[in-house]
Design a protein with these regions (language model features):
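Flexible, small-/acidic-enriched active-site or ligand-binding loops
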Residues: 52-79
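Short beta-strand/turn micro-motifs at beta-sheet edges
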Residues: 62, 86-88, 136-137
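Solvent-exposed alpha-helices and their adjacent loops that cap or buttress functional pockets
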Residues: 2-3, 18-22, 34-38, 63-67, ...
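Long, acidic (Asp/Glu-rich), low-complexity accessory segments flanking structured domains
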Residues: 76-97
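Conserved hydrophobic/aromatic beta-strand scaffold that supports enzyme active sites
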Residues: 25-29, 43-45, 70-77, 222
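Alpha-helical interface subdomain recognition
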Residues: 3-8, 74, 101-267
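A short core secondary-structure module
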Residues: 7, 11-56
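Short, acidic Gly/Pro/Ser/Thr-rich loop/turn segments
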Residues: 17, 35-37, 51-53, 80-85, ...
Length: 267
């Protein structure tokens, strides 16, 4: 976003916008430049239909979660008046930190949705295992399948407790960075495991698109990706439990060491 007088002009594009083309109000986070100098990150409000430079791209043919569109949004000389800018009170340099804090709350919600998908898949599998008969008895009486159902129920119970802990945040202010990340990691990976095992319980019967489990398996896959991948969230948790920033750039550690050495010399 280039600051030009009392306005900000945004050019660029953003992919995988959930609800793109449906939502009227758009909150855009962009890096702000003034006279060619990077000032930090700020938020900008644009209203679809009233902002000429806001364009909605094609809908992505998504693998799952097809109930709401995922689109590209294009910014072509999108002019935002200063009155529609959402700037951090601490200054633009704190804009990225504020954006990431908003993600922490979203992660608890995403983990909850993943848990709901997994719970639904488990309930379908549990019911089917008691109804489906093979070799003269319900398949739930076979020990191997019992173990699968027990593992599914155990993982669901653990995921639910992590989400409740992150949502209640009894030890501090919501959202807690570590608890939100832990809840999303475990719940999202549980959703993939449980939907996959539920498919196995059904066998060929649920490999069909006529039954809901194939949709659940597709929907579950997104939750280890969106809102921070499971791998990035592990880095977030690591930085919290080690109580140190973990740079992701090739020379990040060297820069931190130089900064620490410089501060020590100043003392």
């Amino acid at each position: 976003a280039d600051k030009r007088g009392e306005s900000y002009v945004i050019n660029g594009a953003k992919h995988w916008i959930t609800g793109g083309g449906i939502s009227k109000l758009h909150l855009i986070f962009a890096r702000v430049y003034e006279n060619g100098e990077d000032r930090g990150i700020g938020g900008f409000i644009a209203i679809r239909g009233e902002a000429d430079g806001l364009k909605i791209g094609a809908r992505e043919p998504a693998m799952g979660l097809r109930g709401i569109p995922e689109t590209e949004i294009l910014f072509e000389d999108l002019e935002i008046p200063a009155a529609m800018a959402v700037l951090p009170p601490e200054g633009l340099k704190r804009g990225f930190a504020g954006l990431m804090n908003a993600y922490n709350a979203q992660r608890v919600g995403a983990g909850t949705v993943a848990l709901g998908i997994a719970q639904g898949a488990y309930e379908h599998a549990l019911s089917y295992a008691q109804e489906r008969e093979q070799f003269g008895r319900p398949i739930c009486e076979f020990q191997g399948l019992q173990w699968m159902l027990v593992d599914m129920s155990t993982q669901l119970a653990a995921a639910r407790l992590l989400i409740h802990k992150a949502a209640s945040c009894g030890d501090g202010q919501f959202p807690d960075v570590t608890e939100a990340a832990q809840a999303k990691i475990f719940a999202s990976e549980t959703a993939i495991r449980v939907t996959n095992d539920a498919l196995q319980v059904f066998g060929a019967a649920d490999y069909s698109r006529n039954l809901p489990l194939e949709r659940m398996a597709r929907d579950a896959r997104m939750f280890t990706i969106a809102g921070g991948t499971a791998q990035i969230l592990r880095t977030v948790v690591a930085s919290q439990i080690l109580d140190r920033k973990l740079p992701q750039t090739r020379d990040g550690y060297a820069k931190l060491a130089e900064r620490a050495k410089s501060k020590a010399a100043e003392r």
